[in-house]
Amino acid sequence: MELLNSLLLLFLIYLIHSFYIKNKRIHKNEAKGPIGFPLIGNMIQIGKTKPHIELMKLEKIYNQRILKIWLGDYYSVFLSDIDLIKDIFINKFENFSSRPKSPLTRLGTNDFRGINGSSGETWFKNKNIIVNAMKRANTKTIYTLLDNQVNDLIKEISKFESQNKSFNPKYYFRKFVLSTMFKYIFNEDVPYDENLENGKLSELTMEMENIFKTLKVGKLANSIEILETPYYYYLQKTDKVFKNIKKLIIEKYKNHNLSINPEKPRDLLDILINEYGTTDDDVLNITQVTLDMFMAGTDTTANTLEWIIIKLCNSPIHQEIAYNELKKVVSSKVIIDDSIKREITLSDRPNTPYIQAIIKETMRMHPVVVFGLPRYCENDIFIGDENYFIPKGCKVFINFHSIGYNEKYFKDPYKFEPNRFLENSNNSMDSFFPFGLGNRVCLGRQLANDQLYLVIANLILKYKLKTIDENKINEDGIFGLTVSPNKYKINLESR
């Protein structure tokens, strides 16, 4: 009984101490924020379902675009002010170049290897290797790959138009992105009619979905300091998800290593092997970099494609403007052979500004990674003209959703208006950086942009994208590691 009473007393003292730490002001210039509770901090106030929306409400309450938020035991700031963001991510990059560490990121990044979760010299070395590897990849081969993948996608969904059936494109966009990455990284073709549940991609698809579930935001044990070590060993003991997918990637690595020709790399994995080497540590880095590329380029691109389709279905006027632009470009091409299909390629992009504006406007209104990847403050520092104080150890997040709906940066932010990205008189482009900014900008942004452009342009050229019974599709998102649309279906009508 005495032991129990002692433990309860210790726990009470811990709760009081936790409450005190979370609510004392450490500097007169620190950001404002709501009352922090013991253990959980502000995780209840911002919620799990729509934290980006709740944070926008708090910005109005405190009348500032920087908020102090306790994520469990971790002091964090959420930013939606462009000047402050640029000051941190560009001007003071060295102090904010690292990623914060947690049990989940340690498990998911092979002890902070790779590109997404690494910091310091490890990140700098990996970044240079990946940039060089992507530069060495044959551009012509990549363009051909993308054209073929887009043709396969359109061929596969054309059955719904011919059968006059409604369908949800989620599965097909996800398969398109995974198939593209599979070919780009492993040089393996996936037949367009192959099923994701039992084909070549099945194991990878299943494990990727499990990883996104595992990493879903809001796991309390990942945010309580005294639980960090036991939680990590628990994860290590029970983990099957990361082990399975890393095992799959290592098998691909071994097969490549047996047949590699350093002078003639077949794919990105060959180039990574050439750049890194073949030591045990090199294998761990190659495995993690490969996993990072799949994670960064799968759900983000697939979900963005869905949001663009939804916006086009809900905005038929903008869809027709885009179609007329595409039709003009295609009709101006010299067709040598009637058998050659009239289609959009990446070379047409400079002549299709409205399509690009639609993509950007959708990404503004529906950023799929609303908070980006956090940064870590290495030392106490002041930021911005207001001299906000950011303490050492603070986690730093960008609220992309709040930026996109800020009238200071985007006039009539709740209106879908692609023209805002065609006008030189506004600051839309200066406020638009969906792939991040500074030295840690997303390395795969060009491939992602190419995929988005080719899929959307060729779909609009071939089909009218329509809602069912002319009812608008619900645009409320489901918050997770990425923000995805609710269930919906569309119709295709041949042009």
UniProtKB/Swiss-Prot annotation:
Pfam families: p450. The keyword Iron applies. The keyword Cell cycle does not apply. It comes from the Eukaryota. Its EC number is 1.14.-.-. GO terms for molecular function: heme binding; iron ion binding; monooxygenase activity; oxidoreductase activity, acting on paired donors, with incorporation or reduction of molecular oxygen. The chain crosses the membrane at residues 3-21. It is an enzyme of class 1 (oxidoreductase). It is a single-pass membrane protein. InterPro entries: Cyt_P450, Cyt_P450_CS, Cyt_P450_E_grp-I, Cyt_P450_sf. Keywords: Heme, Iron, Membrane, Metal-binding, Monooxygenase, Oxidoreductase, Transmembrane, Transmembrane helix. It is found in: Membrane. Heme binds at residue 442. One of its GO terms (cellular component) is membrane. Its cofactor is heme. Its main location: membrane. PROSITE patterns: CYTOCHROME_P450. Belongs to the cytochrome P450 family. This is Probable cytochrome P450 508C1. It comes from Dictyostelium discoideum.
